Design a protein with these regions (language model features):
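N-terminal, Lys/Arg- and Ser/Thr-rich interaction peptides
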Residues: 1-40
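Interfaces that engage single-stranded nucleic acids at replication/repair/recombination sites
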Residues: 2-7, 154-173
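Positively charged, aromatic-enriched nucleic acid-contacting surfaces
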Residues: 39-162
């Protein structure tokens, strides 16, 4: 595989510290979340404005129900323009909870209710779309360093080294 094949990937893979945040709670606690606005920015830097140098189309939306909870899912196709030609569809599927059962907090008394109650997210479709976009963009290399574990969100003191830089530094010693 030539470096030419990896040029786009290498241009998109590094995530600046200010575009990352550590997830503070839930099943993903301690993992890295990448700010969605950064993804839009890096795509615009690489391909041009959305709608001109890149765009996406929602192919399908659907919901799934499990007991009393409902999740929403989005399948979309991402397209990028390279050298005047449009790519084939780059598919991404994402999801988010539309209705979930949660313990409701009584903020006045700083207590949680003992019963679970349904919570409806008015941002679920947007969040599922954002998730699907991140899955599609990941295939181009967007934020690859984070997904490959080459960027440590907790101790991020310097830019992540690429695998090639790490290999080169060990070979030259």
């Amino acid at each position: 595989m030539s470096e030419d094949n990896l040029k786009l990937w290498n241009d998109l893979k590094a995530v600046p510290r200010e575009a990352k945040k550590t997830i503070q709670a839930g099943r993903l606690k301690g993992m890295t979340d990448i700010k969605p606005q950064w993804r839009l920015q890096i795509m615009t830097e690489q391909f041009g404005a959305v709608g001109f140098g890149w765009y996406y189309e929602v192919a399908k939306t659907w919901t799934e129900t499990y007991n009393t909870e409902v999740s929403v899912h989005v399948q979309l196709n991402l397209y990028v323009n390279i050298g005047g030609g449009w790519s084939k569809p780059i598919s991404g599927i994402g999801g988010s909870m539309l209705i979930s059962n949660e313990k409701i907090k009584d903020y006045e008394n700083d207590l949680y209710d003992t019963k679970f109650k349904p919570y409806h997210s008015d941002e679920a479709y947007k969040m599922a779309t954002t998730d699907a976009l991140s899955v599609a963009m990941k295939q181009l290399g967007v934020a690859a360093d984070v997904y490959m574990g080459l960027s440590d969100s907790k101790y991020d003191k310097k830019p992540a080294q690429t695998v090639n830089q790490i290999k080169a530094s060990t070979v030259n010693k």
